[in-house]
Amino acid sequence: MDELAGGGGGGPAMASPPRQQQGPGGNMSLSPGGNGAAGGGGPPATEGAGPAAGPELSRPQQYTIPGILHYIQHEWARFEMERAHWEVERAELQARIAFLQGERKGQENLKKDLVRRIKMLEYALKQERAKYHKLKYGTELNQGDLKMPTFESEETKDTEAPTAPQNSQLTWKQGRQLLRQYLQEVGYTDTILDVRSQRVRSLLGLSNSEPNGSVETKNLEQILNGGESPKQKGQEIKRTSGDVLETFNFLENADDSDEEEENDMIEGIPEGKDKHRINKHKIGNEGLAADLTDDPDTEEALKEFDFLVTAEDGEGAGEARSSGDGTEWDKDDLSPTTEVWDVDQGLISKLKEQYKKERKGKKGVKRVNRTKLYDTIADLGDDELPLIPSGIINQSRSASTRMTDHEGARAEEAEPITFPSGGGKSFIMGSDDVLLSVLGLGDLADLTVTNDADYSYDLPANKDAFRKTWNPKYTLRSHFDGVRALAFHPVEPVLVTASEDHTLKLWNLQKTVPAKKSASLDVEPIYTFRAHIGPVLSLAISSNGEQCFSGGTDATIQWWNMPSPNVDPYDTYEPNVLAGTLIAHTDAVWGLAYSGIKNQLLSCSADGTVRLWNPQEKLPCICTYNGDKEHGIPTSVDFIGCDPAHMVTSFNTGSTVIYDLETSQSLVMLSSQMDSGLQSSNHINRVVSHPTLPVTITAHEDRHIKFFDNKTGKMIHSMVAHLDAVTSLAVDPNGIYLMSGSHDCSIRLWNLDSKTCVQEITAHRKKLDESIYDVAFHPSKAYIASAGADALAKVFV
């Protein structure tokens, strides 16, 4: 047996006297872990001194070198193990810390990268805006000191903001500092202040014929036009300081904390007879304003000085310009801003005196026709200019009588059609009031500018900025032949289609299945209506959505009860769905229209008659029109939206007639000067009535869409709308937009006010040289739909 260090001492002790051997041997067996040590020398010791070992056990414990060494080794091993555990835990925590630090750094880098991208995009946008402005107006758009954005660290930005004194002016000083920092980030320097003061002088100095104004004129053109020739003076007059600041609109949507503080500083707004009184420190124009307030043009020009007045107007805050209706910020305790702007008051006073004299001499100056300007810009599709509050548009529309000059016939009206806001929150682009409610502009909605040319240039930008683009969302595929007609449920996202495959189908747009190879969704029909024995050509849904009417080549009108939108497609047959059949026509029924006011139905047929029905009565056919075919064969029919006691019918001869439903007499024949010629070119495919105005719109085989006044019967406007025959029309429930479908495979959306195309959608493929048969707006939801000869119906959102 191997002996440890303690056992080595037992060997020589055997030859020694027994008394000496006993102590170490006995003690070693009692020491901690010493049993193994006594193993080598224990037995000889107990043999020689066994009887004397008993009393030694009660003695105090004594430590030996072998026992101590063994204990130290044991403790050292335990310490090493705990230390290894601690090292592992520390490594794990350090790895966690490093991961979190890396994540934080990555987020910071991402933030910096996004900030850089934003700045670069702002820079690129300004470059594009300048390029576009030069192409359109032929002048350089002054954007201050346009240069590449510089990216400085957050620390330096923080040190730039000085600690403002804690006084009453702390709020607006912080706002000014914030704006100054914004200006530096986007490349504007203090020269913007000089440009703005020069702009004021340009309002007065460019029209100045005296020599002392010529120097200012040249300097201004050097600043604004980059050395352009004086030929652009007229255009420079039209552009005001708002143009210089138009690139600052990216600040309008910023969620600044200063906004609430600034709102607290706004005082009461003067109204009514006080509109011409200016309640704050002017720069030298107190007396002059009082002298000239009787002239509105003078008042307009003098209001251009308002952005020089208080520090709250900020260096470059376009939305803080004083509004033309007297909405101004009154803070008399603010310090004068002469040192801020560095304006030569003497020169300003002198120029104003000259302006006052000139105004007395030119009272009858002809102003630019605002509507012509608006129409021209609308035709150009001005997308790039910044948007302006809708209040400006309302003000501009009401401020002048708008003569439109699309055609000579249209100029007979002093006030052309203005398209108001209807109910239903205008899911389409909507009128200005609806836009304001949707966008929630709040106080910003009251801000206006007072220069005619300024918002004439920006007007179409507002329309385009709020423009909604329709995109295909659902494809309805279950028909086996061309889809001739479709109609939406008045409330639910439900659609009914009528097809040449002899059936009608009910679709719930909320029950969709993913399409195989496209981003759109396929919808399965939830019900199929079967009663016609030929192609179904026309369709109408009652105003409460409970009944549906369909007409076909079998000369019948089928009357249906609408199933529930949640009906099971595989449920048992329900005979109550078919409510009845209206029989009176002798040929195909090509058009249907329903009026919810008296629950009446109109139908037009290839037999030459137009019939009025009340399906609830025992003798449902109330009246028959055009029984002698005096106007030709009717092709389409509709109730007059603003006068339900009248209806309008189009004929294949090109004539359109308004009838009185009570007397059955024709009231007005709608005709245009060009309605003489071939019958095929005059053929009208569809007639619709505007929902709120006395206007009738017709779609023609010769690619035209024509607008008629119901009162005079004269054509208001005519336009070539498509590349092929126009087959279908629909007006949105608010009466702002018109949708047309054509055999050229396209759907076009038109602004009824400007008669311009807002959007074109290629929706269907041709089949036998025919494409789109019908289009429809949902009465209350953001859906439009089209029906095509390719057996598809498509829904857009």
Curated annotation (Swiss-Prot):
Positions carrying N-acetylmethionine: M1
Extent of Gly residues compositional bias: 1-12, 33-43
Modified residues (Phosphoserine): S202, S214, S229, S257, S335
WD repeat locations: 478-517, 531-570, 584-623, 679-718, 721-760, 767-796
Primary residence: cytoplasm
Flavoprotein among keywords: no
PROSITE patterns linked to this entry: WD_REPEATS_1 (PS00678), WD_REPEATS_2 (PS50082), WD_REPEATS_REGION (PS50294)
Residue positions, PTM Phosphothreonine: T150
Region (Caveolin-binding) location: 71-79
Chain intervals for the UniProt region annotation (Calmodulin-binding): 166-183
GO cellular component, one term: postsynapse
Compartment(s) where it occurs, according to its Swiss-Prot or TrEMBL record: Cytoplasm; Membrane
UniProt region (Disordered), positions on chain: 1-60, 313-336
InterPro entries: G-protein_beta_WD-40_rep, Striatin_N, WD40/YVTN_repeat-like_dom_sf, WD40_repeat_CS, WD40_repeat_dom_sf, WD40_rpt, WD_repeat_striatin
Function: Calmodulin-binding scaffolding protein which is the center of the striatin-interacting phosphatase and kinase (STRIPAK) complexes. STRIPAK complexes have critical roles in protein (de)phosphorylation and are regulators of multiple signaling pathways including Hippo, MAPK, nuclear receptor and cytoskeleton remodeling. Different types of STRIPAK complexes are involved in a variety of biological processes such as cell growth, differentiation, apoptosis, metabolism and immune regulation.
Oligomeric form and interacting partners: Tetramerizes. Part of the core of STRIPAK complexes composed of PP2A catalytic and scaffolding subunits, the striatins (PP2A regulatory subunits), the striatin-associated proteins MOB4, STRIP1 and STRIP2, PDCD10 and members of the STE20 kinases, such as STK24 and STK26. The STRIPAK complex can be extended by adapter proteins such as SLMAP:SIKE1 or CTTNBP2NL. Interacts with CDC42BPB.
Family: Belongs to the WD repeat striatin family.
Protein name listed in UniProt: Striatin-3
Organism: Bos taurus (Bovine)
